[in-house]
Amino acid sequence: MKIIIVCYPTFGGSGVLATELGHQLAANGHSVHFIAYEKPVRLKDNDETIFYHKVNVPFYPLFNFQPYELALSTKIVDVAKKNSVDLIHVHYAIPHAYAAYMAQKMLKMNSINLPIITTLHGTDITLVGKHPFYKSAVKFSIEKSNIVTSVSQSLKNDTHEFFDTQKEIEVIPNFVDIKKFDNQLQKCSSQDSKMTITHVSNFRPVKNIRTLIKIFSILSGKFDCKFNLIGEGPELEIARSMSEDLQIKNIYFLGNTNEVEKVLCHSDIFILPSKTESFGLAALEAMASKNAIVSSNSGGLPELNLDNITGFTCDYNNIQGFVS
């Protein structure tokens, strides 16, 4: 098959999952065309089965905000026509599913009928989708998609509740390439005697970064341990400032990386105290790296991290619970 994948190109879970899915589809003999405003950070295009198409948004002074959705719809139509595409798979409802629906209608005018699969990832429903400015558009996009999938049962339930829709939603959990993590573990030889605790995120407020730093502060005073923080985002500087004010020892801000497995293989514990988390792909990557998981019990995390089995869970604001 020839498949279009539309996703965000960033380090967030939806973009990473979409990219890894494309790689696996290509490995199984399909041609995959990625469409985004930048090349996805983990994408390895090969000019044979994986292709990247950039969405360019022309600047017009008339527009206060440039119309990305229109440019995306047009790019989907262009790629579909030129490559005889069979399927459109969009990750994150807004604006991708909305733009795909418009592209689908334009293609029908040329007697081209392409189905749309929309995968819901979390904040497209729990944050963006709940906003009154976007709620109607999100509901419309979901109901007009041919197939809708969700990364967790929790997110499926939230979608039905928030949007009062009866649209059938299939739960397909996120995945990782176990072979990649196993190969890295075999190469990994850490001589560090310190217990290493790692956090990976985009440092948005929903990731509960301030609580995370407070947890690190208490642990730093009790144990000889090291803290690795991977990622960048709006609360990164707050985290740096708090760690300095609290005089946390052995805390390292490592920035973004395309090879998270090379850091996680040196880690013992992975912590994710998110206020809400529809799946928690970073936690799954940490599991593949043989980390014990300590996470909040929010959203879909309890479906992934089973308390007292794969790790431990507690309320996201329970600092002492995380420390224990």
Model regions: which residues?
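N-terminal subdomain of nucleotide-sugar transferases
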Residues: M1-V41
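An amphipathic, basic-hydrophobic alpha-helix
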Residues: P61-L87, A97-M102, P132-S136, F140
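Nucleotide-sugar donor phosphate/pyrophosphate-binding loop at the beta->alpha transition
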Residues: A71, K108-I117, T123-S141, I178
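Conserved donor-binding/catalytic core segment of Leloir-type glycosyltransferases
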Residues: T149, Q191-K207, I213-F216, N228
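Carbohydrate-associated surface elements
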Residues: S154, F175
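Aromatic "clamp/platform" in nucleotide-sugar-dependent glycosyltransferases that forms part
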Residues: N256, K275
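Short hydrophobic beta-strand element within catalytic cores of glycosyltransferases
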Residues: A292-S295, N305
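Conserved acidic donor-binding segment of nucleotide-sugar-dependent glycosyltransferases
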Residues: D307-N308, F312-I319
